[in-house]
Amino acid sequence: MGQKVCAHGFRVGPTLIKGWDSVLYAEKHYKTLFIQDLKIRDVINKGFNQAQISRVLIERPSNKSIIININAKKPNIIIGRNGSEIDKLKKAIEKMTSLKEVYINIHEVRKFNIDAAIVAQTIALQLEKRVSFRKAMKTAIQASFKQGGQGIRVSCSGRLGGAEIARTEWYIEGRMPLHTLRADIDYSTAEAITTYGVIGVKVWIYKGEYTENKRYN
């Protein structure tokens, strides 16, 4: 089971170790708000893809307000000069949601080498720049262990190296207890758009076991 399902989704729940990316309560308009959250996330990820965004957490404490927490490797790109970019984003979200109380919090990811989303995006960017996929994967693995990772698995799928036939290659180092629900495993995917076609990148990073005070990070 642990080998097949998404490592993050497998651990989401009030009694488990991962939290939801959208926090809201709505009896009648849940579908509308959920689709709205997806659109907001899409605008942020596509508009600031150079910032290497790790996570977008959207909270709706009331019907009149929305709080958006963005974790990124390069927060300055999202903020812009004198806050110009974040002001544009705020106005776009106000127009999209018809809410006047829009709060955006930007957080810098300091240990980005053990953040699966950022690692996957970094590998994808290197593949687009024609760096060898083996070199990109091995570099990511080495950097992960330097920042405290206890295990990492990286997979690349597609026409690797311009080969005629698509294939999948992966590397794994350290522990990767996918069946252990208390294991803190970060998982993410990314796509590299190359001249040979799309190459899919998957990253799993094991950071140790959860304790009570480490939950919902």
From Swiss-Prot:
InterPro entries (UniProt xref): KH_dom (IPR004087), KH_dom-like_a/b (IPR015946), KH_dom_type_2 (IPR004044), KH_sf_prok-type (IPR009019), Ribosomal_S3_C_sf (IPR036419), Ribosomal_uS3_bac-typ (IPR005704), Ribosomal_uS3_C (IPR001351), Ribosomal_uS3_CS (IPR018280)
Disulfide bonds, paired cysteine numbers: none
GO annotation, cellular component aspect: cytosolic small ribosomal subunit
SMART domains linked: KH
GO annotation terms (biological process): translation
Protein origin, superkingdom: Bacteria
UniProt GO molecular function: mRNA binding; rRNA binding; structural constituent of ribosome
Family matches, as Gene3D superfamilies: 3.30.300.20, Ribosomal protein S3, C-terminal domain
Subunit field text: Part of the 30S ribosomal subunit. Forms a tight complex with proteins S10 and S14.
Function: Binds the lower part of the 30S subunit head. Binds mRNA in the 70S ribosome, positioning it for translation.
Family, similarity comment: Belongs to the universal ribosomal protein uS3 family.
Stated name of the protein: Small ribosomal subunit protein uS3
